[in-house]
A protein has these predicted regions:
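Basic nucleic-acid-binding interfaces
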Residues: 1-84
Length: 84
């Protein structure tokens, strides 16, 4: 699973086998928490996450949704800068 970004202690990753894991999403890991977020709107898809970190991941996904969707479609993964 390529790491896309480290965001204030949150690791944002994407699975390599994206075609088997629709709808397009990213995984976020923060300490003991793991969750999946939709790329299209940044909403929590599965798992649990603290509220402030959930808001930060959503903001990140919305900002980079085009880049994340392109990675999902092509399998060409690269690191994205964190947001403030």
């Amino acid at each position: 699973m390529p790491t896309i970004c480290f965001l204030n202690g949150i690791m944002i990753i994407m699975h390599l086998t994206n075609k088997e894991h629709n709808p397009p999403h990213i995984h976020a890991i923060y300490g003991e928490y793991e969750a999946t977020f939709y790329i299209i709107d940044g909403e929590l898809y599965e798992g649990g996450f603290p509220i402030n970190e959930k808001k930060l991941v959503k903001k990140f996904v919305i900002k980079y949704s085009n880049e994340l969707l392109e990675m999902w479609k092509t399998g060409n993964y690269y690191k994205l800068p964190p947001i403030n």
